[in-house]
Amino acid sequence: MNIRNLLNDRVKSAMNDAGIPADYSPHLAVSKKAGFGDYQANGAMGAAKALKTNPREVAQKIIDNLDLNGIASKVEIAGPGFINIHLDPKWLAQQTVAVTNSTNLGILPKNNPETVVIDYSSPNLAKEMHVGHLRSTIIGDAIARVLEFTGDKVIRQNHVGDWGTQFGMLIAELEDQLGSGERPELALQDLEGFYQQAKKHFDDDPAFADRARDYVVKLQSGDAQVNKLWQEFRRVSLLHAEEIYRKLNVTLGEADVRGESAYNDDLAPVVAELEAQGLAVEDQGAKVVFLHELADKNGDPSVAIIQKKDGGYLYSTSDLAALRYRVGTLKANRILYFIDARQSLHMQQVFTLARKAGFADEWLSTEHHAFGTMLGSDGKPFKTRSGGTVKLAQLLDEAVERAAKEVRTKNPDLTEEEMAEVASKVGIGAVKYADLCKTRTNDYVFNWESMLAFEGNTGPYMQYAYTRIRSIFRRANENMDTFESEVNLTEPQEVQLAIKLLQLPEIVEQIAADAYPHVMCNYLYDLASLFMTFYEACPILKEGVEPAVKTSRLQLSKGVARTLAQGLDLLGIEVMEKM
């Protein structure tokens, strides 16, 4: 049950009955100031301007036709024509019981679910995953979870970099190490070191470099032995990535991997088709497309190179092939790409060219959801102290170690097994939440102290709020999972908490449309903060609290806990019974 949509539909119907043209919107939103109702409809002003009449008169006509019987306790006009809607506590109480006892917390599946392809993570298999891969991986995964929760069919695509000239060098190095008796898993246990060693041999040994270049040709022509070595390198590299995904609690699996190599046979046909349509032309030996739709301020067209002078293909070619596959084979209605902001022009070129070539229909939604960079305290891209790339595995291990110290200080009574579980969930959750709570398009500064804090808008604070409610139920000798009670909202803190609790469907709907996970973080923080205020003002377990009041407040608390757990789960963050 989506309160905003319900009220919007009722106000829209009232506007129609009041004779207001259908193209005017109710402009319904959550009220930002206390005393101005719980929701506010601001459409009267725009309609009045067009109708050349007094906005308060228009607002009154809307109210005269507005049916919110049993939903609102009061509807009033404020200022120049704002319509303030005060929700009825009795109705809120009924909705709270229904929602907190429902399977999906009142979120109904879509009437018309879409097939959504999401391209995210997509590391280069030649190297270990580093912090630069974190944002795409966890933001993309959060949106995949949200869209599945709404009922969409989500197809994850991990477009890994498993092809290219560097693989000749890596295969030659792997062959040398296997020839000396090394097992693939051991040879590649340090992917970064392996890459550096291969690069050194390539730079220092002309014979090795010649063999590496020869292997590129053989790999591209389908040589069985070289292909076998490449498959082995790819297999072990993917195991590295899958271990990171497991630590991060990310839903990507082996079945979601469809790398650049999957499109090898499609590249030449894509170029040929673009040439046949007159879109691709030869320019200085290369094959390019001039995109006047993306012209610069001087009117010069944007140039997309689809085949190099030496016959090699580029990312734009494989991305076009991938997009055509996602439309033609996967039958996508919507395609989302989580790739950093530096690739914005590239993605615009791919989308524009795909439509010009007929690979994607005009109605298809192709969306590049860009993101900023993780920065160090110096304001520069996050690096090691020596200036090297920070490996993601090392970052996550350090997060768990730091979390263990914090948790051990706060709760030394935990068993070693409990400590390990809590430290893992708190540490990984802290890293993910610190990233996801920032507006996706902004850069942000990585800071251990703030992300592991147990107060403020942090992962540990959200997890703590959940465990605190679990603790309340244990002290009440009640099983939260099976507990059910009527709700009676008499105190303002109860009413405000119930309203916030019931707004989850609005939040999920917004994230599904805009792909900004920080909206969920802000919502959960507001919910947790309102719960703490409610808990201080409205006793639950104190002596003298009437049984009906106690059970009502326990039911409200259960709703908060379930919403916190669900919201965090949609972000890929786990909760625990105690911490």
Curated annotation (Swiss-Prot):
Q: Which GO terms describe its molecular function?
A: arginine-tRNA ligase activity; ATP binding
Where does this protein reside within or beyond the cell?
Answer: Cytoplasm
Q: What is its EC number?
A: 6.1.1.19
A Gene Ontology biological process in which this protein takes part is:
arginyl-tRNA aminoacylation
Reaction(s) the record says it catalyses: tRNA(Arg) + L-arginine + ATP = L-arginyl-tRNA(Arg) + AMP + diphosphate
Enzyme class, spelled out: ligase
Among SUPFAM superfamilies, the record links this protein to: Anticodon-binding domain of a subclass of class I aminoacyl-tRNA synthetases, Arginyl-tRNA synthetase (ArgRS), N-terminal 'additional' domain, Nucleotidylyl transferase
Q: Which UniProt keywords apply?
A: Aminoacyl-tRNA synthetase, ATP-binding, Cytoplasm, Ligase, Nucleotide-binding, Protein biosynthesis
Keyword Cytoplasm recorded: yes
Q: Name one GO cellular component term.
A: cytoplasm
Q: Where is this motif: 'HIGH' region?
A: 123-133
- Mind telling me which PROSITE patterns this protein's record contains? AA_TRNA_LIGASE_I
**Which InterPro entries does the entry mention?**
aa-tRNA-synth_I_CS, Arg-tRNA-ligase, Arg-tRNA-synth_N, Arg-tRNA-synth_N_sf, ArgRS_core, DALR_anticod-bd, Rossmann-like_a/b/a_fold, tRNAsynth_Ia_anticodon-bd
Predominant location: cytoplasm
> What does the annotation say about its assembly with partners?
Monomer.
The record's annotation in NCBIfam families points to:
argS (TIGR00456)
- What protein does this entry describe? Arginine--tRNA ligase
State the organism of origin: Saccharophagus degradans (strain 2-40 / ATCC 43961 / DSM 17024)
